[in-house]
Amino acid sequence: MMNENSNFIKTIMKNELENGVVDHILTRFPPEPNAYLHIGHARAIINNFELSEYFGGATNLRLDDTNPSKEGAEYVEAIINDIKWLGYTPKTVNYGSSYFEETYEKAVLLIKKGLAFVCDLTHEEMAAYRGDVVTPGKN
């Protein structure tokens, strides 16, 4: 499906395989299961699966189910069905929530090493630091 000269990403992947930077290609599709997929998701699915398959690799489905108040099994099932409908099968199906404990432990370790910190900014302060389309953020 992909043209030989279709994009720079494929060129980079090819070079990294040829130069031994990586020995295989494994991509992922990481949706948050809080709504049905849209055309942008379909494009991402096609890109990831086609690139990995072109190089003999695979694609994992990693469901970013880290906001349980907005997510549901209905959306998980719909996402898996949509991927199949597009003609693809993920190598594995993983859930972000499966790694909560490990993520927490690593965050604590980074904080203890002085490599991370707990942010105590309010929502408004954080928005001011980020800026927006017409206002630059601040340091």
Model regions: which residues?
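Active-site neighborhoods of enzyme catalytic cores
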Residues: 4-15, 71-139
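N-terminal catalytic cores of NTP/NDP-binding nucleotidyl/phosphoryl-transfer enzymes
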Residues: 5-14, 18-80
